[in-house]
Amino acid sequence: MSKLSRATRTLKKPEAGGVIRSIVRAGQAIPGPPLGPILGQRGVSINQFCKEFNEKTKDIKEGIPLPTKIFIKPDRTFELKIGQPTVSYFLKAAAGIEKGARHTGKEVAGLVSLKHVYEIACVKAKDDAFAMQDVPLSSVVRSIIGSARSLGIRVVKDLSAEELEAFQKERAVFLAAQKEADLAAQAEAAKK
């Protein structure tokens, strides 16, 4: 190998650093995939990250998805910035559902009132994405309504407990029928 090729190889060494954005569940950071390999490639101690993340999120209900930014420094240390839970988490919790609609626009997965949307907007307005750009609360509300639509959640003006309970019972029947249809389709496909 010539001196020139060795010199260029030493110049092209990748510099450790950068930002990794990910959604990690509170108290559930583990050394395995998906974050383990990414941090390992950057030379960051995976066990140290898991320990620090789980320590910082110990006061938060376990399993809540948290947007996380990991700033990797050139000396291969890191700095964590943990955001608030995602809008979809808040909307699904307010609607009392686990998943959004399978066919958005054709089915309604849940119901939330404008009061719920306003409360979520008040919390998310403090988030970096909105606070840094000085976004007015009305725009945050519209953004959350758009997210609700994409999840198949209908936003209604007022919502009583009885209306919500009736909707959830109707939705449970619909999901059971949908699951039966899926199982029948799988059985039919297996026969072929």
Swiss-Prot record:
Superkingdom of the organism of origin: Eukaryota
Any GO MF annotation of the entry: structural constituent of ribosome
GO cellular component: mitochondrial inner membrane; mitochondrial large ribosomal subunit; mitochondrion
Region forming the signal peptide: none
CDD domains, per the entry: Ribosomal_L11 (cd00349)
Keywords on record: Mitochondrion, Ribonucleoprotein, Ribosomal protein, Transit peptide
Gene Ontology BP terms: mitochondrial translation; translation
Similarity comment: Belongs to the universal ribosomal protein uL11 family.
Alphabetized HAMAP family for the sequence: Ribosomal_uL11
Stated name of the protein: Large ribosomal subunit protein uL11m
Organism: Mus musculus (Mouse)
Recorded name of the encoding gene: Mrpl11
